[in-house]
C-alpha cells in the first residue's frame, strides 16, 4: 500500500480448524442463530456455502470476482459425485469456465476410495464393488477427500467441523453438463 509504505496483501484463508472453533465460541456467546450458527461449522473464505444447491458453473461465477481481490492466495472448487473420467467433456467445460471466469486457483474434487482388504481403488458407496464387503465388517474403507486444495488423507483424520462440512457438500453429478 502506498499510503502505509508497506506491502499489503489479502488472503482468502481456509482457516480449517477455525471454522469449527470460532463457531463454538460464537454459540456460547450468542446462542444458535438460524442461518448463522445453526450448523457445525462456518463456511470459510468467500465460498458459496457448500450446502447451497446451485449449478457448478453458477458457483464459479459467484466466487470468481473475489480471486482478483485476494492476491495472497485463493481457491474455488467444484465437488463431483463420482469419477470425472466418465465425462471428460463436462470436466473440461468446468476447467475452461474457471479460466474464463477468472478463477486463479481452481480445484475439482471427487471421491477417491480404497478398500484396504481387497485393495480396490475407486468409488465405494456402502459396499465394495469388488469384494462386496461393507464398513460394518470391521475394517473401514479409506475415504480420501480434498480440503484446502490438498488431498490430506482419510476423513477420519479431519476435525468434526470439517467432516460435517464435507458431508454437507453439494456433489455435482458427473454425468451432467454442470448447468449454466
Role assignments for model-derived ranges:
Residues 1-180:
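Long, C-terminal-biased catalytic regions of enzyme "large/alpha" subunits
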Amino acid at each position: 500500500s502506498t499510503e502505509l509504505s508497506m506491502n499489503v496483501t489479502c488472503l482468502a484463508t481456509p482457516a480449517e480448524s477455525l471454522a469449527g472453533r470460532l463457531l463454538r465460541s460464537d454459540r456460547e456467546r450468542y446462542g444458535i442463530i438460524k442461518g448463522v450458527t445453526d450448523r457445525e461449522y462456518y463456511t470459510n473464505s468467500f465460498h458459496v456455502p457448500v450446502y447451497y444447491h446451485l449449478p457448478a458453473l453458477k458457483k464459479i461465477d459467484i466466487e470468481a470476482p473475489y480471486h482478483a481481490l485476494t492476491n495472497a492466495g485463493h481457491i474455488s472448487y467444484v465437488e463431483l459425485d463420482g469419477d470425472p473420467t466418465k465425462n471428460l467433456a463436462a470436466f473440461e467445460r468446468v476447467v475452461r469456465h474457471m479460466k474464463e471466469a477468472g478463477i486463479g486457483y481452481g480445484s475439482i474434487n471427487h471421491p477417491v476410495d480404497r478398500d484396504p482388504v481387497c485393495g480396490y481403488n475407486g468409488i465405494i458407496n456402502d459396499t465394495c464393488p469388488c469384494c462386496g464387503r461393507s464398513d460394518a465388517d470391521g475394517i473401514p474403507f479409506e475415504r480420501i477427500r480434498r480440503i484446502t486444495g490438498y488431498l490430506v488423507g482419510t476423513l477420519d483424520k479431519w476435525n468434526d467441523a470439517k467432516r460435517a462440512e464435507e458431508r454437507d457438500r453439494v456433489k455435482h453429478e458427473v454425468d451432467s453438463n454442470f448447468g449454466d
